[in-house]
Amino acid sequence: MRRQEVLKLLGALPLLALRPSPAAAMGGTLPELDQLAPDFNLESAGQSGALGQRLQRDDFRGSWLVLYFYPREFTSGCTLEARGFQRDLSLYPAADAAVVGVSADGSDKHASFCTSEGLDFPLLSDPGGAVSKLYGAWIPPFSQRHTFVIDPDGILRARFVGVNPSVHSQEVLSTLQELQV
């Protein structure tokens, strides 16, 4: 390698320190456990397709929140995961917990999915991925399959990354029970 090429490479090294980490550039970084969970304020659909209500983290203060991110409605994994949460939904009140889903799909598609699958929990629309990125769950143009358990004070207590949709709701319920002992 010639001296000029080496000097150019050495001169470029400080610029590498200025660029965001690959995780931050892609999906954001996972929020830290035992810290205040990132806030959100997103439009919802749910309870068999009701549209338009905006929900935020603080709406759930005083109870546990299961906030799950998923890539896209009407796909096999996302449908399986949503059905699992719906199947177990009657068990969440015993843990004083609410279930809320988040994806980049629009509210109309959420409403259609809720109606089609008989979902009785809200789905939030994050079309630009801003909230998904705050939770380290964004790879454009989709949210990744991550779940976060937030306590009644808004503190992040558990996170699940790259989940198995067929058993995930049961894993979340088990974790809620462990956290509440």
List where the protein language model places each region.
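Short loop/turn microsegments at loop-to-beta-strand junctions
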Residues: P38, W64, Q144-H146
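Short, internal strand/loop/helix patches
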Residues: V100, A111-H146
